[in-house]
């Protein structure tokens, strides 16, 4: 059984027991949360597709950890103009473990 839900402006395909990395959520570690923006649910035989969301669809998860991703470097460069600019960024994330999928 798997589901596709929306969180942080992105869509995620998940199964029960899977750990997913999402955009930072404000929930506390260990807290259980529900995602109600479910776009699709499949149980192996039938597929339910929402238009755009499934009424009563729910993905239950538990917040495992918060953290920051690896640093990326942003470099601006203009040739022959003696212009170089370098900047770094580390994006915040939240790891959640999928507990259940309810259709």
UniProtKB/Swiss-Prot annotation:
Signal peptide feature range: none
Any single GO BP term: translation
A GO cellular component entry from the record: cytoplasm
One term of GO molecular function: rRNA binding
InterPro entries: bL21-like, bL21-like_sf, Ribosomal_bL21, Ribosomal_bL21_CS
Claim: Ribonucleoprotein is one of the keywords in the record: yes
Pfam families recorded: Ribosomal_L21p (PF00829)
Keyword RNA-binding: yes
Keywords of this entry: Ribonucleoprotein, Ribosomal protein, RNA-binding, rRNA-binding
NCBIfam families: L21 (TIGR00061)
Function of the protein: This protein binds to 23S rRNA in the presence of protein L20.
Family in the record: Belongs to the bacterial ribosomal protein bL21 family.
Subunit-structure text: Part of the 50S ribosomal subunit. Contacts protein L20.
Protein name: Large ribosomal subunit protein bL21
Organism: Hamiltonella defensa subsp. Acyrthosiphon pisum (strain 5AT)
């Amino acid at each position: 059984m798997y589901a596709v839900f929306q969180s942080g402006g992105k869509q995620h395909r998940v199964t029960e027991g899977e750990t997913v990395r999402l955009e930072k959520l404000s929930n506390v570690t260990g807290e259980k949360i529900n995602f109600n923006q479910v776009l699709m649910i499949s149980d192996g035989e039938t597929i339910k597709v929402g238009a755009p969301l499934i009424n009563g669809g729910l993905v239950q998860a538990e917040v495992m950890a918060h953290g920051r991703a690896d640093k990326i470097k942003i470099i601006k460069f203009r040739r022959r103009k003696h212009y170089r600019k370098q900047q770094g960024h580390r994006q915040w994330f939240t790891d959640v473990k999928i507990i259940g999928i309810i259709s």
